[in-house]
Amino acid sequence: MVGGEAAAAVEELVSGVRQAADFAEQFRSYSESEKQWKARMEFILRHLPDYRDPPDGSGRLDQLLSLSMVWANHLFLGCSYNKDLLDKVMEMADGIEVEDLPQFTTRSELMKKHQS
């Protein structure tokens, strides 16, 4: 009977993961590539339990979605943000691996090259 219980537990886990992914899919932007979306969805799903909206509707989910966009925009588009905000999202994303990220040159790096 233990094998049957284990199989049921695995099926329940898989079902929960599927439901979470289906829930997150509604937040995908039409302009996101598959690579960008998979990374951002991992960010969202990782923190979703901590950012579920309470009954008073205080917008915790909106905050999580905004943080996920800050992280994705920084990673994939090279956008810059306030240091505290960037530190927060980078800490939240710790352990999420994204391959073949674009390389960006900052304005200050360009200015240093120009002055040399």
Curated annotation (Swiss-Prot):
Record annotation: effect of changing Y81A: Abolishes binding to XRN2
Superkingdom: Eukaryota
Domain (XRN2-binding (XTBD)) ranges: 24-116
Keywords from the named record: Acetylation
Protein name in the entry: CDKN2AIP N-terminal-like protein
Database matches in Pfam families: XTBD (PF11952)
Keyword Acetylation included in the entry's annotation: yes
Positions of modified residues (N-acetylmethionine): M1
Record family assignment: Belongs to the CARF family.
UniProt keyword annotation of Electron transport present: no
Summary of subunit composition and partner proteins: Interacts with XRN2; the interaction is direct.
